[in-house]
Each structure stands twice: as C-alpha cells, then as structure tokens.
Amino acid sequence: MTQAPKYSLCELALPDTTIEQDIEIAVGSGATGLSIDEGKFGDRGPQDVAAMLSAAGLQAVACIPAVMSFLPSRRINGPDDIGERVALMCEGVRRLAELRPTSILCLTGPAGELPSAEARKRAAEALHTLAAAADEAGVPLSFESFRYTDPNDYSVVFGLEDATAFLAEAGRPDVGLCYDIWHLWGSSERLIELTRELAPRINVVQLNDVREPTRTWDDRLLPGDGVAGLPAIFAALRQGGFDGWFDLEVFSDDGRWGHEFPDSVWKLPWLEQARRGHEGLLRAWNESLQLAARQGA
C-alpha cells in the first residue's frame, strides 16, 4: 500500500463542537472520514447523521457508542451495573451500524473495586456479548487497549500482546484492534515487530504523538510533533498489510480537566488542529516510504 493514507477525525477529541461543525472541520482539513460519537447525536436519528455524512462525502470510521466501556469508570458515561452497560452498548452498536462505519470502538473500562481476575473475566464475557450484537448488525468491532502507566480509569488490558490474549479469552480472536499510538508507544520492546505481525488485525490507527516527558494522560501531541517515531510505525503497518484509517485523536488539556497546559494543542482552533494533523500524517507517511526504501522493504 503506497497510496496516500486515509485520514479521519475522531469526535471524542472535538469536545466543543456539533456534528455539523465536525463535518465542516473534516472537509476543511482534507479528511475523508469521521468517527462519530453517539453522544453527539442529540435528537438526530442515525439515518439523519448518515445522510449528513453522505452529503459531505465522508465515510463513518471508528464510531463510538455513548457507553463505550464494559466496566464502569468515573471518566466514562453509563450506569454502574455491567449488565446495563452492555445492553446500552449493544443498542449503540445497532444505532451506529446504520452509518455503515468501518468499525465500532470498545474498551474494557477499569477494574474498580473488582479483583483484577474477576474484572477481566466480566469484561471478556461482555465483549463476547457485544461482538455477537455487532455480528448481527453487520459491523466490525475495534477493541482498544491502554497504556499501563495510566490504567486506573479506562482499562484492564494493556498493550498489543495483552489485547490479543484478552480477545482469545473472550472466545472472539476475530475481533479487530484499535491501535492508539500514544497508548502503545513504549509498551513493548517488540512494538515495531508486533505492529507488523498484527497489522492485518488492526481496523483503525488512532493518530497522535507522544510528548517526552508526558505530563498526564491528556498531554498528547499532533502527529510529527513528538517522539513516537511515526515513520517506523507507519512502515511496519504498511509492510504488514494495514490499509485502514488514521483517525486523529489528540487529547490535550486546556484546563477543562484540571491541567491548564500553556502549550495545549486544544488552545488552537479545531480546524487548525485538524489541518496540522493531516500535514503531520503526510510528512510522516512520506518519511516512512523513504525509510522502507532504505531498508529494501
């Protein structure tokens, strides 16, 4: 795959805007896809949102249910009861499937007060249920693992190897992966090798970069502005056969979450962020082609 990479925007990282505004930002930045957050539907139905995307020439990419984790978290919407959460997630999958997205995102959520083994077991059972609902709706899932250094509010699964093990435990090794660059950077000494090996299982790459040192979980950078080594990652993805979307998702606290970083990316206009994200992707992509040529790959 040497054609230009497919670029999309994730609505989770556009917290102040409407779907209409996000569509304008996507088109203005050169993106051809948008990962819709069900939480932004408001009083619109899925068919309304699908029509808006179609009119703008945008593909629905890795869409996000209003409840996106199996286990409850203070940072993630939804009830405390796991069964109720999973039921709402299944409803979200059915609604989002009407957009014909490339996939729908899910994650475990944190263990909370549950013993770690019990939390993992409950999450695996929930994933199995959600995957069945996704099968019925005709849409793939993308399962996201998290960064081990900041696990308490989002996940019980950390890194690519743990993610594939978890999916096997759930009896659904066919479920695809969400590859978040910020979360996976530094997760394994074999990251590039694993990226190449698992590329066929990756549905979407969440595009961002890593500040070093990272101050908090919401201190991410636009692609090309950090130390993640995007060209090597992109080369490995391409060599492994990945042909999916690069979905811009940069969380950078401007004060709303308690860390008012003076250099927060979120202090930039949303359209400027999206344009710079696209430019950074293309620069790193071209560098990855040059890297592969030097390596003879």
Mark where each language-model region is:
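Active-site acidic/histidine proton-transfer and metal-coordination neighborhood
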Residues: 75-176, 186, 268-272, 295
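N-terminal small/glycine-rich loop or linker at the start of catalytic domains
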Residues: 1-10, 62-75, 109-110
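Glycine-rich, proline-tolerant flexible connector loops at the mouths of alpha/beta enzymes
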Residues: 35-54, 110, 114-115, 150-151
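Histidine-acidic metal/acid-base catalytic patches
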Residues: 1-30, 54, 94, 100-102, ...
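Conserved beta-strand positions in the central sheet of alpha/beta enzyme cores
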Residues: 35, 62-64, 105, 142, ...
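Short acidic, glycine/proline-enriched helix-loop-strand junctions
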Residues: 44-63, 123, 139, 264-267
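Active-site-proximal loop/turn and secondary-structure-junction residues that shape catalytic pockets
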Residues: 13-15, 38-40, 66-69, 108-112, ...
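N-terminal substrate-binding region of glycoside hydrolase catalytic domains
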Residues: 25-44, 64-68
